[in-house]
């Protein structure tokens, strides 16, 4: 995913428009004195609107149905009824727990274990390598300036620069075979 862990953990179902495919980042999860609560995001630029692909929307719909069944079984014991990602008692999942769940999913799928932040980095790298504008990438990641994006992912931009040079070289100086 391309969200910070706290943003992902703080998602409520009213932050996701399943019919239009839009996800709104409006909160982050903070933990104080052992209690989790939603707070405003890291910066004003962190609040954002992200369009989700259809396959993610399908997975979210399935998750929502499964979660509704679990909430029904739990009765009144479900702690946060609107949270998207919860533990077995319906309380917020914290980042470390999400990473444990992600590791289990990867193991079941026969994939190497990864962390949530790796998904954020991969998302940014794929966008960069697809020549998406730095401003669009910065907006999706919640960076207030493109400088943050460029500084953080400069190595990926450098790789793209080499590919761009090779493409120009092929187009201008090499004959198609």
What do the predicted segments below correspond to?
Residues 50, 66-74, 80-139, 143:
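Short, basic (Lys/Arg/His-rich) helix/loop patches that form interaction surfaces
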Residues 20, 28, 33-56, 62, ...:
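C-terminal secondary-structure termini that scaffold catalytic or DNA-interacting sites
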Residues 15-22, 113, 132-154:
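Short, polar N-cap/turn motifs at the start of nucleic acid-interacting alpha helices
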Residues 3-29, 135:
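Short, charged phosphate-coordinating catalytic segments
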Residues 6, 11-14, 96, 122, ...:
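Structural detector for helix-capping/boundary residues
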């Amino acid at each position: 995913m391309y969200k910070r862990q706290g943003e992902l953990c703080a998602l409520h179902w009213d932050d996701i428009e399943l019919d239009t495919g839009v996800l709104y980042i409006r909160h982050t999860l903070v933990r104080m004195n052992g209690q989790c609560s939603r707070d405003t995001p890291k910066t004003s630029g962190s609040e954002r609107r992200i369009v989700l692909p259809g396959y993610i929307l399908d997975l979210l719909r399935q998750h929502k149905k499964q979660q509704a069944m679990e909430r029904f079984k739990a009765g009144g014991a479900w702690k946060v009824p609107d949270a998207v990602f919860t533990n077995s008692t319906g309380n917020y999942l914290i980042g470390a727990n999400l990473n444990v769940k992600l590791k289990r999913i990867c193991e079941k799928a026969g994939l190497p274990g990864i962390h949530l932040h790796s998904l954020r980095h991969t998302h940014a790298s794929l966008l960069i390598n697809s020549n998406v504008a730095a401003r669009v990438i910065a907006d999706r990641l919640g960076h207030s300036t493109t400088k943050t994006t460029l500084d953080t992912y400069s190595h990926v931009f450098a790789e793209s620069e080499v590919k761009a040079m090779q493409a120009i070289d092929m187009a201008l100086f090499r004959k198609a075979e």
